[in-house]
């Protein structure tokens, strides 16, 4: 499926296909179906407790490594060993897997591998968007495996989740469950355009104003390449995300359970957490990033004046990555 996706991308992306998916050198250290674990290159002598990055299931991971100048991963790898879970290009073959397969089994396997490699019993973790939701759920299920937890624009409390909550409330989830093995990536990408209908116009205007800047064009083209690389969402996992998280808000209420019946209990979390949210976020509004009242573990919050994507690639992204790294290192 990865090869098919690559062929499709070459046909549709044109010149953008020549842009790399992530700029920091890396190697794949294990793979299970679509899911793989990547280890990024660090300067000689860099050691310490490894960091696991859990990206969103809804788009490609390399928004966190978009150019040499704008990269969470590159900055982290200067200080610590860095790993990332690459969800690949899921299709019908994984449509039967529940959401907990990703937020528990897959993350646990990655953490165990890292602990064996580095002789440690826990790791530091950063989760972005729904990847942050999954990282948080994992920290509640396996509290002894996570030391520092950075929740980067991660929705946890879905009571007032804005336009995406409205979308989930009106989405025909039961009909989807009966008829679809996955939510097509192209349809998800198309839907996002309607969330901010003026976004394309604003982007075009920005291009007109700044196209003579080489730095701007490098980032602009890299971002367009990322946008042209959509990811499908596994069917059962998508159903669980809409019903258990958005519609029923089970995670925040301490009622979410895995497919095996394990309770995702916020009161069980013991890791030190940083809520790193974005003041202009329309995907994960500030209120959705707050932790449940039953979660009494240490937590601090830093709000960056940017949007959901801008916090990783915009002018304030360096402030965000610096805040995350300082939290982990301290």
Q: Language-model features: where?
A:
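Gly/Ala-rich beta-loop-alpha elbow adjacent to hydrolase catalytic centers
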Residues: 126-131, 135
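Catalytic histidine-centered segment of alpha/beta-hydrolase-like enzymes
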Residues: 283, 301, 306-321
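Alpha/beta-hydrolase-fold enzymes
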Residues: 116, 120, 135-236
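Short beta-strand/loop motif that positions the catalytic acidic residue
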Residues: 269, 275-277, 281
């Amino acid at each position: 499926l990865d090869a098919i996706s690559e062929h499709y991308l070459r046909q549709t992306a044109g010149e953008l296909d020549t842009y790399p998916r992530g700029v920091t050198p890396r190697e794949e250290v294990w793979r299970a179906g679509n899911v793989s674990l990547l280890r990024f290159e660090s300067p000689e002598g860099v050691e310490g407790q490894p960091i696991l990055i859990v990206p969103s299931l809804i788009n490609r991971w390399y928004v966190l490594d978009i150019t040499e100048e704008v990269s969470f991963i590159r900055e982290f790898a200067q200080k610590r060993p860095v790993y990332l879970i690459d969800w690949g290009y899921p299709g019908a073959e994984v449509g039967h897997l529940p959401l907990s397969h990703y937020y528990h089994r897959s993350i646990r396997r990655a953490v165990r591998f890292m602990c064996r490699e580095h002789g440690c019993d826990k790791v530091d973790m950063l989760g972005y968007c729904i990847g942050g939701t999954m990282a948080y759920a994992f920290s509640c299920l396996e509290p002894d495996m996570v030391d520092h937890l950075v929740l980067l624009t991660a929705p946890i409390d879905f009571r007032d989740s804005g336009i995406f909550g409205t979308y989930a409330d009106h989405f025909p989830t039961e009909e989807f469950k009966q008829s679809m093995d996955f939510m097509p990536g192209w349809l998800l990408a198309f839907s996002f355009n309607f969330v901010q209908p003026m976004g394309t116009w604003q982007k075009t205007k920005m291009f007109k104003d700044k196209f003579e800047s080489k730095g701007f064009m490098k980032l602009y083209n890299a971002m367009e390449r990322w946008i042209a690389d959509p990811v499908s969402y596994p069917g059962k996992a998508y159903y669980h995300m809409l019903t258990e998280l958005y519609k029923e808000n089970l995670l925040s209420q301490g009622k979410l359970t895995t497919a095996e019946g394990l309770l995702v209990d916020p009161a069980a979390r013991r890791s030190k957490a940083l809520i790193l949210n974005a003041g202009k976020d329309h995907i994960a509004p500030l209120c959705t990033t707050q932790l449940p009242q039953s979660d009494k573990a240490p937590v601090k919050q830093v709000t960056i004046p940017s949007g959901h994507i801008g916090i990783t690639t915009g002018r304030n992204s360096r402030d965000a990555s610096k805040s995350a790294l300082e939290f982990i290192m301290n």
